Regions:
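Metalloprotease/metallohydrolase-associated module, dominated by Zn2+-dependent proteases
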Residues: 199-302
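Structured domain cores in non-transmembrane regions
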Residues: 131-166, 278-299
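C-terminal motif of bacterial Sec signal peptides marking the signal peptidase cleavage site
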Residues: 14-17
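Acidic/polar, low-complexity intrinsically disordered N-terminal segments immediately downstream
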Residues: 19-111, 266-302
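Solvent-exposed, acidic/flexible segments
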Residues: 86-97, 143, 161-170
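Auxiliary, metal-adjacent structural segments of Zn-dependent hydrolase domains
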Residues: 94-146
């Protein structure tokens, strides 16, 4: 009997405890990171930005704090280096949206952009620079985590000539391609490396027979990052330790940056069969797997 009474008492206590619990209210509202439209850009521009967000869940921002867009400081030589992004005037937002469409977004399919090809935040800036304390280094873009900052939103944008615009396209797409690889959005087909000998270093391709033998082994030149002139990436023992990476990079630079006319010298040479095979492997792979037309990118000169 005592056990029955004890059980009833415990049950009654539990019921009382439950009845005195505070009721759970509605969950806190999750606020968006940014509110669109942001400011006084044209209605058309704000509508385009809203459409980008609705499609890709990515913010294109022209009204922001510098720290929000990009703020990194590093110690160097006892000083502090700070990256800065300067906002542009909102009257140039329309032209800037056209600009990023022309040099970047048009080359990637919607499904790819939805999966992360469009970074979560894209900041439109007048200019971007590294403040070293004693001077500034200007940049046309910076990739910062899952954000991209693009400079140029100023009066010079609408007057940009075709040569400059092509250079900006090549710079930005090179950076974004590396970003996509790092994020796992793109990869490299193993078939590209299959028939190339990366074990036995060739003779230095300085000129003449050595250069021809080097080409027949399937290697292209690269481009000087400052002058833009073609040069051989294999100039000694060290670059050969990264032969695979250098080989792929040289092909991708030609594929993305050069027109059909500019690459005819190796595509039309019957002696360069391996170069042509590797070339077509990359074109076919990215078109089939990602619907990215590398030759459309290379042939776009504005």
């Amino acid at each position: 009997m005592k056990k029955i009474l004890l059980a009833i008492a415990c049950l009654w206590a539990a019921c009382i405890s439950c009845s005195e619990d505070t009721k759970i209210g509605a969950p806190d509202e999750i606020l968006p990171d940014y509110v669109l439209p942001q400011g006084d850009a044209s209605k058309e521009a704000n509508d385009r930005i809203q459409q980008i967000f609705d499609t890709y869940t990515s913010y294109v921002l022209y009204n922001y704090t510098e720290k929000d867009a990009f703020w990194t400081q590093t110690a160097a030589g006892g000083g502090v280096q700070i990256y800065r992004a300067i906002m542009g005037e909102s009257r140039y937002v329309d032209a800037m949206l056209d600009y990023i469409q022309d040099i970047w977004l048009q080359f990637f399919p919607e499904e790819f952009l939805k999966k992360g090809g469009m970074p979560y935040r894209v900041f439109l800036a007048d200019s971007i620079y590294l403040d070293r304390g004693w001077g500034k280094t200007l940049y046309n873009y910076r990739v910062n985590g899952n954000a991209l900052i693009i400079g140029g939103m100023n009066e010079d944008l609408t007057a940009m000539d075709a040569v400059t615009k092509r250079t900006r396209k090549n710079e930005l797409l090179g950076a974004m391609w590396d970003y996509y690889i790092a994020q796992g959005l793109l990869n490299v087909p193993d078939e590209f490396y299959k028939d190339t000998d990366y074990e036995n270093a060739p003779a230095l391709p300085l000129a003449g027979e050595n250069l021809e033998a080097y080409r027949k082994r399937g290697f292209l030149p690269t481009f000087n990052s400052y002058s833009g002139a073609q040069e051989e990436w294999y100039w000694g023992d060290y670059p050969w330790t990264q032969a695979k990476e250098n080989d792929l990079k040289s092909f991708m630079l030609h594929l993305r940056n050069q027109t059909d006319e500019e690459v005819a010298w190796f595509l039309n040479n019957p002696e360069y069969e391996l170069i042509q095979k590797k070339w077509n492997i990359l074109i076919d792979y990215y078109k089939k797997e990602f619907d990215i037309d590398l030759r459309k990118i290379g042939n776009t000169t504005f």
